[in-house]
Amino acid sequence: LAIGFIIHIIWASVLTLQNQKARPVKYALRNQSQNATWASRNMYILGAMVLIFLVIHLYNFWWNIKFPSLGTPLSAITVGGVEMEDTYTLVSSLFESSIVYCLIYILGAVLVGLHITHGFWSAFQTIGFSNDIWRKRLECLAYFFAIVFAVGFSIIPLYFIAGLGN
């Protein structure tokens, strides 16, 4: 997965540089037409913001779970006779301690959703589904998938903001 992200970032950087070299002089008036969504026009910046969110997310969760001696040590709980790390306490302590972190996490989920929206249908366009019939269907599917993703990941901090964590 990590290698896939690295390749994705490198390829996105190469494509962005190629696009900039193809048109070294910027347009005098930027066309805000329906041919290009906000996400597609700002994909590289959106990707950078998603990367920042991903680093924050991995540091706060993955790092603390995989390397508890270097971060916040996790307590152990027993579920069904199996001892495991108490990751619920880690998640709840982060979201209950700061409304700012909750808002950053919700914003991050929305940014990932926007990034996915363009990337989803664009990937299918790359492999040949670029006619008018398929493009509209894939755009709808991309929006649906992005909304499910953003709402799904936003539910966790919203759950704690609403005070339902205890």
Protein language model regions, located:
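Membrane-embedded alpha-helical bundles that constitute the cytochrome b-like, heme-associated redox core
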Residues: 1-166
